[in-house]
Each structure stands twice: as C-alpha cells, then as structure tokens.
Amino acid sequence: MEKRVFRRKIYNAIGEWKRKSNGQTALLIEGARRIGKSTIVEKFAQEEYRSYILIDFNKASQEVKSLFNDLMDLDFIFLRLQQIYSKILYDRQSVIIFDEVQTCPKARQAIKYLVQDGRYDYIETGSLISIKKNTEGITIPSEEDRIQMYPMDYEEFRWALGDTATFPLLQIFWDKKMPLGAAHREAQKNLRLYMLVGGMPQAVNAYIDTNNLKAVDEAKRRIIRLYEEDFIKIDPTERVSKLFMSIPSILARNVSRYVPSSVIGEVEENKEMELLKSLEDSKTVNMSHHADDPNVGLPTTANYDKFKLYVCDTGLFITLAFWDKDFTENVIYDKLLTDKLPVNLGYVYENLIAQMLVASGNKLFYHTWPKDEKHYYEVDFLLSRGAKLCPVEVKSSGYKAHASLDAFSAKYSSRIKDRYLIYTKDFAREEETLYVPAYMTPLL
C-alpha cells in the first residue's frame, strides 16, 4: 500500500506558530491517535527546517527517555540525540519533535528549559495529554502553545481524491445563497462517500489504493481496536471502552442525553467524571453540552452534567455502529451508497454534522425543553455568531418539517440571527428558515 502524505490545513497553522513564536514557545498538537499528527509534523520539519530529530516516545529507548531526567547539561543531551539519531542540529534552523509525548512526562516537563535554552524549536504531539497518569509528578510547561488536530475534514478528503474545485465553488453558492441545481446530486453523492470512508488517513489511503469499502472497513477496525487497547490501559475494567463503543447505540435511541450509568452501571460520581475526562482527553469523541439558557455566551449556560457524545470521525462511527457484524452485514454502506438511508439510521447524519461543526472551529451545544408530559423539543446544535445564536436542526432526509426550530424561534426570537435546517436536498430559503444541504455545513 502506497504511503501518502495528505495535504492538511493544520500545516499553515504550524507555520503561523513558527513565525509568531520565533523560538519563544513549543507547539503541542493534540488529537486522537491515527489522525496524521506525526506525518504532517514530520513533513513540516522536512520542508521548513534545515534538519530535525523525531523522537517517537512509543518506540524510544530507555536511554533516550532517561536523557530528560537530568537537565543540568543540555549540551550533553543534544550531543547524545545527534549521535543516536545520526542527525546534525543547527542553531535556530532545526526542530526536535516529541512524538506521543504523553508517554514520557519528563520530556514534556523539560520543554520549559529547552525553550529557554533557545537553540532549537520544539513540536510535541500527543493524546491523553491531561489525564492524571500522564501529568503526575511533573510541572506542566507554560511555554506551550496548543493546537487541536482532527481527522481529515470533508474538504481535506476531497483534496485527497484530487478535487480542489468543490469547496471554492460551494463557497460561492453559499455566499450568494443559491441552490446548486443539477450539481446537487453529485455533491450529495460525494458527501455520502466521505461519510462511509471518513477522515482517518489510513482509511482514506485504503480507499484510494483499493476502491474497496471492505478494505476501508478493515482499516477502520484496526484503528478502533487500537483505541480499545488505549482505553484498557487507562481503565482495565473496560468502562472507558464501553462508554466509547456504545455511542452509536445511545444516539440511535434518540434520547436527550448520554447517561453513563446506562452503559457502565452506577459508579461514584468522581469516578464517573474521571472516566469521562479520560474519554474526552483521548480526543476520540466530540462532546456536546446542554445549554440550559441558550444565549450568546453558550459556555456560561452549559450544563456539564447533561451532554451527548459523538464519535470524532464519521467513518469510524459507521464501523462502530455495526461492530459485531461482518462487513457484508453493515447495511449503512449499501443504504448510503444508494441514497436509501432509512429514517431510523438518521443518527449517522447527526454524528457527521457534529464532526463537521467541530472541524470548523465550533464548540458543540444543544438545547431541549418540554413539549408536553411525554415529549420534548430539541435543537440539535446551537452556533454562536456575533451577538446572536443560530439554531440548527438536522434531518437525514429531504423533509422540511422543523417543529423544534419553530418552537425555539418563538421562544427566543430576540436572540436569533439565522436558523438552519440541515438536510439532504438542495439549498432553499423559506421565510426565516435556511435549508442547507449537509455538504455546506462547514460554511455555516
């Protein structure tokens, strides 16, 4: 299988850090495993520096790790690294990469003194950066700038397939609030392919190499098994793993919140919070919090005890939804490819939209309130735009019913800028509602 280095948007963000920091801070890139952190950082090092050393702390020898236990002689540390990795480092022209830095906390603590030394730049990558096991006994360096990295978004996926035209064109149509017309069907078909393959580079690579969704599914299963192994290292009782693996089944129930006890049973509140924090810190999930009083300052009204969980990648989500079934039994592949996804599988779109919104820089919030004694209204997502809110309702079909949007707009009319219904048909505007095809979600 050919190893490809895909074009990623974060490359420009790393370049911006290098220019602004000028050696005054290290850069920490956080994100789930297997999203391409190491690959893009190494590509940046190759193209933007005279030389680099990449230390993968998952593979590094004990000698390399022990170098960071005593920082009294930095000259010796740099000399040994150059010998071990057969690289020459040049003052202000080289970068040292700490890959999977969470597995060597002492190296992360050393960043403070390495940055102060000033000879080289430092880029760290990792996940599970903040959990107790990976921070116990060390001082977190303040000389760190952080960037969050995600699986390949829809535009990056199109780039990987050689399509650089779609998004500039979509932007034009969005700016003019125009439907695509005859081009809509093709645009929607392309989105459905992204939903199935997802944005994990290994899965995208498998698709490009084989044009075979079974091979793609196998690549995604390997990633999920890796996540399971990580979760078991954190919590040998497998509760973190269960919280992750159950996300599709919880979303399928269309309930207003994720209740951990329904998955792992009753545990002490502090322990439940610790398990959820570990899951969130793995960056494998996107968490949406309930906004009790939806207003422009959404975080200030967030209820952190009431939340929903989404899988960080649409492709992984689809594999996870049919985890116990053979690939041939995963009906989502066939139904999505043929555009016949039944309503009871609509949660696939909800997870997709959550991922798209997060990749576009949005924090996730939602809002529910009683309709009557047995039913409730729900706005799937709330976006903060200027001094106003944009409520978002997601449909997995072309239906234009939007009772929750209407009720929300009536209740909070003075707080609303635009109201969106994301669905599978072409762009349209009817009265106050903008009907947005799912592939335009990144432009909201």
List the model feature ranges, each with a label.
Residues K59-R92:
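Short glycine-rich substrate-engagement loop in P-loop NTPases that contacts/grips substrate
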Residues Y113, S130-R146, R158-D163:
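Short regulatory helix/loop adjacent to the ATP-binding pocket of P-loop NTPases
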Residues Q46-E63:
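Conserved catalytic segments around the Walker B and adjacent sensor/switch elements
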Residues E2-K3, K18-R19, T25, R34, ...:
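A cross-kingdom feature that marks ATP-driven nucleic-acid transaction machinery
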